[in-house]
Each structure stands twice: as structure tokens, then as C-alpha cells.
Amino acid sequence: MRLIIGIFTLLLSICPLHKENGNKLPRLAVSENRRFLMNENGAPFFWLGDTGWLLFSKLDRKEAEKYLDDRAEKGFNVIQVIVLHQLDDTNVYGDSALIGGNISLAKVTEGNSFENQKAYDFWDHIDYIVKLAEERGLYLALVPVWGSNVRQGKVNKEQARTYAAWLAKRFADNPNIIWLNGGDAKGNQNTDIWEIIGQQIRQHAPNHLITFHPFGRSKSSMWFHNADWLDFNMFQSGHRRYDQDDTELAYGQDNWKYVRDDYSLEPIKPTLDGEPSYEGIPQGLHDPSQPYWNADDVRRYAYWSVFAGGCGFTYGHNAVMQMHKPGDQNPEYGVREYWTEALDAKGAQQMIHLKNLILSKPFFERIPDQSLIASEKGERYDYQVATRGKDYAFIYTYNGRDIKVKMGKIDGEKISASWFNPRSGKTTLIGDYENKGTRNFNPPGKIVNGIDWVLVLESIK
């Protein structure tokens, strides 16, 4: 038996021991115009997230290093991960987080040496991965407790208060932490518990950003937009097709509509899609006889939402989000490959192109501007979306339809036009044009869903 030396109620005032790192990641903040994120030095931060929900519980130290190395190499800078998925879960080393599944009773042992099995506990493993991520330039967006536990009545208000305070204090000095309150949760249910968790994190980790990860086809702004603890909004556009969406909003796959809604709210807060359809998961989520979402789909979600005004985007893959590996007894959602194979999925490799495109131009001045499009914007897969700064504009088409542009929206008497390929990241010059009137641009190739293009317009000075 391990020596249990603490419970949350006794640990609230105890700070964990961490190695000092002379090259700490800068903390994150909301930009001055409240539309975007930046680091504490004022540099742009484009959120490019990956979904690694079960990183802490399913991967050992070497596997975690492999995963984080890969995501850093592919340009991701945020990993979304759950601290407590189920209250009785154990990690890959057989360690449980809690005493008796009670969220207010931590199972913490003396020491943290990996060579000593009695010392290295569940929380030490998380500490180790947090530091691994920081060393690779990665931020971890932590869900304190998955929403199903709260829905099922396994967490009461006092337990939530104790746990959230302890957890926030434990990681308060780690610069690479972001908080995702909720966790596939409806904020109008158990609202008092979600408010308590948000307030405790804000009180005890005041330098960390906080948002709320909501239930599918809903958004944090529906319940918490005015909460003092909520720094930016997040929505989950979810995993359903147009014909599968039976919600009141009925936005289906049009995730740009969530951004449009949040963009109009006061006070101004950044927003992003924190869970679109995952690559490699059945359409509708639960029935593996349905078609599976692919790289074309996740690109569409990414460009639609970011060009509509989003401050970033979170990608996900079915196998990676659940860290599916050989020997898993209950793999979920029709998963067809192991996480190690899915690391190189096409969509995961293509996400960096969006990040590079956005960061190639002045970041904080960018706005959505549909008035650039002189023709019909289109519906569903025909929808075109435009964004611009003072001397540049991007217009996205998912299927290569002609783009008719109302010129004169950016500075300069002349503009240079080019095609940016979201599948490869390559740019092809079209030519120079007078910056007035309207002009039609015909993308390369046929009109086919998934043959997507970004029209890039730049002022010639």
C-alpha cells in the first residue's frame, strides 16, 4: 500500500515542487481589441489545437513524448486534454487520481521519483507531461472534470469548490496552462457547479485563460458570456451532418454561424471551434455504418470558422482523441486505426497551412468581411467566406466555385492576386489588377467538394 499523505482539503495551501525552467513559455492573454489571443509580450497567438483527451490516462512517458513531439512538429500549439475523465479511472501505470472515487480526496503520495513506483503517482505523471509540453512550446488546455460526472451527480458543489481550488493552485505557476471548464457539458444544467469551478480557477490561477467546453452544437456564450471568469468563448459544432442536426439552432455543418453569433456579442470576447467533426469518425458519431468525416471536412470547418472571425481552431482525430491502442477492450465511435497511425492523418498534416497563412499577414487587424464577395455567398458546401486586413484579403471556397470580388475593399490602386492551396500550403500567382469595380476569379480545376482554394489579394505599394 502507498502512503497517502494528503487529501485536497489539506493540500489547498501546499504548492507542488517543479523544476525551474529558465526558458518558460510566455503566458497567454486576450488581445487589446478583444478579438484574438496573444502572449504576454504582445505577439500574436493563433490557437491551433489538437484533441488529446486521454493523454494523461492512456499514454506512458515515452508515448506522451512521441505524441507531443509529433504535434509540435506539425505546428500545433495547444493540446486539449481531460484531467479526470471518470472519477474511478486509473492511468497507464495503474494509479488512480482519487481516494474512493471522491473528487475532493486526492490520492497523493510522498515523493515523485519515476524510479520509485510508490512515489510516482497519477498527479506526478500529469506534472511530467505538463513539463514535457512546455519544453516543446505547447500549451495544455485542461478540462478539470468531464461533464458526464457532474451530470450523473457524482460531484456536489463543495467537492467542486475543493477540487477546483486545489487543481488551480497546483498548476498556477505553469505558464502553459489554459482551462476548459465544462467538458461536453450543457451550461444550463448544474450551472452552480460550473460557476464554482470557473470562479475557483480564476481566484487561484489568475494568470491563466479560462473558457468553457460545451455540449455538441452549443456554445459557451449561451450561458457564460458575461461571467467574469470566462476569457474567451468556445463552441462545439459537433459531429453531425446537416440532416442529422435536430437541435434548435439547426446549424448543421455551418460552424461559421457560431462565430457570427459570438462576434456580435458585448462585451467582445474571442471565440473558436473547440470540437468540430473529428477526422476518422462516423458522421453522426455513433453509427460506424455511416460515412466517416475526412480531411476535406476538417479543412472546411477550419477555414470557415477562422475566416468568419475565429481566433483559432481545434482539430481532432477519432483515434488520437481516445489514444486508441492495441489491447483496448472498449474502443469507441467506430475507430479504425491506432493513435500512432493516425498521427499522420492527412488533416493533421494540413492544419499548419492555415496557421501559416493567418500569421503571414498583420494579425490583430483582421476582420470578417462578406462584402468582399460580390456574388451570392452560397449555402452549405457552396458557402464562401471572406476575411481581410487593411492591405490583404482572403476568400475561401470549399469546392472551387468562381469567386466574384468587389474590389476596393483593401488599400492600394492595384492588387496582386494568387491562389493558396489549403491541401498543400502552396501559392500560385494569378496576376496584378486594378483595385476597383468587380472581378471574377476562377479557381484551378473542376468544381468538386474538397478541392478547396483561398483567393489571396494583396495591396501593391
Q: Where are the regions that the model predicts?
A:
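Bacterial Sec-dependent N-terminal signal peptides
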Residues: 1-22
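Short, flexible, glycine/charge-rich loop motifs used to bind or transfer phosphoryl groups or to couple energy/partner
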Residues: 14, 69, 167-170, 200, ...
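Non-catalytic accessory regions flanking glycosidase/transglycosidase catalytic cores in CAZymes
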Residues: 19-74, 389-391, 405-406, 410-430, ...
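Active-site mouth of glycoside hydrolases
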Residues: 25, 30-244, 254
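Generic structural signal for beta-strand residues in well-ordered domains
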Residues: 28-30, 170-172, 203, 223-226, ...
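Extracellular glycoside hydrolase catalytic/binding regions
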Residues: 176, 182-322, 331-337
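Aromatic- and carboxylate-lined catalytic core of secreted/periplasmic carbohydrate-active enzymes
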Residues: 267-271, 278-282, 294-431, 444-461
